[in-house]
Structure formats: structure tokens, C-alpha cells
Design a protein with these regions (language model features):
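Short, Lys/Arg-enriched N-terminal segments with co-localized hydrophobic residues
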Residues: 15-30
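Compositionally biased, intrinsically disordered low-complexity regions used as flexible
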Residues: 14-15, 46
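Metal-cofactor-dependent catalytic cores
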Residues: 27-295
Length: 295
């Protein structure tokens, strides 16, 4: 079940609900409007609101997010999050770019082998800690207590739970951005728009602008991996923050509504069949008939 996304999430716009599976007469008929596309880049975000981390490749597991994507969050005031019974919480409970744009001024890195999380500011290391130990989490919490006091509603606390992701939606999905749609937004804004404003997992090159909205209900094939496109992503004020300068320099949701009649960009997809995907891999649409034959 999909939970509302704080200040962003809503139902899929009626004008996009017709993007279900396309029926074809036979397996020989080409899938209409199926342009060649590939994965341009892959990113994860180990701590919600903090730095994107590029991945050359990643192993996907059915029904899960990217490994360690939004694995941690920084609680901003009591959330009653229970690590023994983790449940979706709206982003308002955490430090986040929608309200706390200064987060983008930090350069952070999470090391999978050691669970060490490092924070740099202006190229200088300012905090480091093991996020799987109480002492290490305290080191990171102390940094935010000192440096983000004006943003805090209570003591900052690093939250995590096995298998849980602090995503903006309750379902475990991956997010996909069409780079041509970002280019269309850039044209409307009249100035460069860094695709990382959208904090997606898979960035796709080759689709026409807004083509992703026609894929709702379709299954994407990336080698042996299968992804089911589930839902448009509604955008909020987080995309107004430049990921390099940390300045809130644009009002992209307003620009999108004015120029395109919506504030959606990208889609969520569920991992149906797992495997490894890499930057440069081609993306195809699996026909409904082939899906039935393989089921």
C-alpha cells in the first residue's frame, strides 16, 4: 500500500492513468513507441537527505530498494520510530532537503565494508563514525547537534533498522529519472538543472521527454532483471535546492506546473526479477504476451 509523501505525494494525475500495458496482436509486432534507452548512471543515498553516491553497477533483489538506499535517517524531533517494528514515516520527521537545504553543503560517504560514515565540509573532514555502533552514531549526532542547531526540533538521532528504507514512499521501489524530461524542465527554467536535484536511483538516456509516464504498468527489462513501473513521482521543494551550491535557487514545481500542467518527474518501479545492472545497460519493454508465457 502506498503511503502519502509529505507535502509532495498525491494520486497519479488523471491525464497519466492511461499508461497501462500496451496490447499487441502478436509477438512479432513491435512494441509501439519503444525507443532505445540505456542506464546513464546509478545512484544511492545511504543517509536520507545527504550526498548521492554513484555506483558503476548494483545487484537488485526482488521487492527491495537498492542496497543501503536511505538505510539511515537523521531524526529531527521525536518520531516514535521503532527499530524492532519499523514502519514508514513522512519525511517531516527527519532532516531533509525540502526544509534543510544546508545538508547539500556536506560531502558524505558511507563505506559498506566498515559501516564508516564520513562527513566533509568544504573539503575538510568534520565528522566520522560507524553507523552500526552506538558510539559511532553519537559522533555523527554530535556534529549535527552543533552545526544544525537552528534546524533542529529536538536532539538529532541516527535511525536505522534491518531491511528498512527511509524512502518518501512506503513501498520498496527504485526511482527512475528520464534525462530528457530533466532537459525539458531545464528549458522551461531557462537555466541549467542538475539531474541530481531529483535524487533518483536510475538515470535513463534515450527516452523522449516524459516518455516514462506512458510506461505505467509496463515491465522494463535490463538484461535478466525485470522492473514493473508503478507510479509517477510527484516533486516537492527539495528539487529547488542546488546539490552543489546548497542554495534554494529555483522554484521548479511551480515552473513545471506553469509549463507542463503537472509537477511530476520520474517513476517508481518495483523489482520483480533480480540481478545485476550497470551503467550503460540497455533498457527494453517486455511485451504482455511474453510476460504471460514466462509466468
Amino acid at each position: 500500500m502506498w503511503e502519502p509523501e509529505f507535502a509532495c505525494e498525491r494520486g497519479t494525475p488523471e491525464k497519466f492513468t492511461a499508461g497501462g500495458a500496451i496490447k499487441r496482436k502478436s509477438l512479432e509486432d513491435p512494441m509501439p513507441n519503444n525507443p532505445s534507452a540505456k542506464i546513464a548512471s546509478i545512484y544511492r543515498y545511504p543517509v536520507k537527505g545527504l550526498s548521492p553516491e554513484p555506483l558503476p553497477s548494483v545487484k537488485l533483489t526482488p521487492g527491495q530498494t537498492l542496497p543501503s538506499d536511505r538505510r539511515y535517517a537523521i531524526e529531527n524531533g521525536p518520531s516514535k520510530f521503532d527499530p524492532d517494528n519499523p514502519k514508514y514515516l513522512p519525511k517531516a520527521y527527519f532532516l531533509m532537503l525540502m526544509r534543510n537545504e544546508r545538508l547539500a553543503s556536506l560531502q558524505t560517504h558511507f563505506d559498506d565494508a566498515t559501516n564508516i560514515f564520513t562527513i566533509r565540509h568544504n573539503g575538510r573532514e568534520v565528522a566520522q563514525g560507524n553507523l552500526e555502533t552506538a558510539e559511532g552514531r553519537a559522533d555523527i549526532e554530535d556534529y549535527f547537534r552543533r552545526e544544525f542547531s537552528s534546524d533542529l526540533k529536538g536532539a538529532p538521532k541516527i535511525l536505522t533498522a534491518p531491511g528498512h528504507s527511509f524512502s518518501d514512499v512506503s513501498a520498496k521501489v527504485v526511482s527512475i529519472i528520464n534525462l530528457a524530461s530533466v532537459a525539458a524542465i531545464e528549458g522551461a527554467a531557462g537555466q541549467p538543472v542538475d539531474p541530481l536535484r531529483f535524487r533518483s536511483n536510475l538515470y535513463v538516456d534515450g527516452w523522449p521527454g516524459w516518455h516514462e509516464f506512458s510506461l505505467l504498468g509496463e515491465t522494463l527489462a535490463i538484461g535478466d532483471v525485470r522492473l514493473k513501473v508503478k507510479k509517477n513521482i510527484v516533486r516537492c521543494a527539495a528539487i529547488n535546492v542546488d546539490p552543489v551550491t546548497a542554495e534554494r535557487d529555483l522554484n521548479l514545481p511551480k515552473t513545471m506546473v506553469q509549463h507542463f500542467g503537472h509537477d511530476d518527474c520520474g517513476v517508481y518501479a518495483e523489482i520483480i526479477t533480480g540481478g545485476t545492472v550497470a551503467a550503460g545497460d540497455m533498457i527494453e519493454i517486455v511485451s504482455p504476451e511474453l510476460q504471460l508465457q514466462s509466468s
